Amino acid sequence: MEFVVTLLVTFFAGMGAGLGTGFAGMSAAAVISPMLITFLGMEPYMAVGIALSSDVLASAVSAYTYGKNKNLDIRNGLIMMASVLAFTVVGSYAASLVPSTTMGGFSVFMTFLLGVRFIVRPVMTTKEAMAGVSAKKRAVQSVVCGVLIGFICGFIGAGGGMMMLLILTSVLGYELKTAVGTSVFIMTFTALTGAVSHFAIGGKPDATVFALCVLFTLVWARVAAVFANKASPKTLNRATGVVLVILGVVIMLFNVLT
């Protein structure tokens, strides 16, 4: 019976996380961690480690799918990733100096708001409009935005994927598919760094839960990424919006229940 419960929890956690990753470049930690903590009574630190591990492969397979469909800006993605990683460390150091408050609710609320935004005001930027920005300007923007995202993620400890999607579409004027593709590409490496450090500090995870979460998240992320790359911009905006709103509401309910 215990295995059935584990199977169901990891299946739905992986499904939510995978769809969020494949459609919107959302971090799996936002979905998987609260479910493992609530239903399987797992240690929060371990749950986050498993969620980040699930993120690595799911983000990698999504990035590969987006890249294959020419919806990935690797050059600026690498520039942004360098500043995100560097300033995540600065952000977490700054967070250790101030009184600790849980800011997890902030990222959940942001997920919900971002979902509403995609439904109400779809991102209809085209690749042609993106090409109009000079390479130098885009590189500078990538560094500045990476610093901002990294610092906030390190300080709050969450919301990286959503923050990136928001900034790529709103500030940098990316077309939605390229924004998600670039976001999951960066997240593959940030999640890997996080997962390795979690297990280095916290020890080995529960092998069954770990394997199931990674597998289910990977499968659903692949499904979502394939659909996202075939869909028209309007359909994709709606689908992304709906997925984010549902996930936002579900996670908020979890937080209330626990």
Roles of regions detected by a PLM:
Residues 54, 182-198, 208-221:
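A small-residue-rich subset of transmembrane alpha-helices
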Residues 126-127, 158-163, 174-178:
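Short, structured loop/turn "capping" segments at alpha-beta junctions
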Residues 18, 48-56, 180-191, 244:
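Transmembrane helix-bundle signature of multi-pass membrane transporters/permeases
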Residues 1-19, 33-39, 44, 65-151, ...:
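Juxtamembrane transmembrane-helix boundary motif
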Residues 1-6, 10, 53-64, 158-168:
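Hydrophobic, membrane-facing alpha-helical anchors
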Residues 42-50, 75-76, 173-184:
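Membrane-interface alpha-helices at helix entry/exit sites of multi-pass transporters
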Residues 23-32, 157-167:
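Transmembrane helix boundary and interhelical junction motifs in multipass membrane proteins
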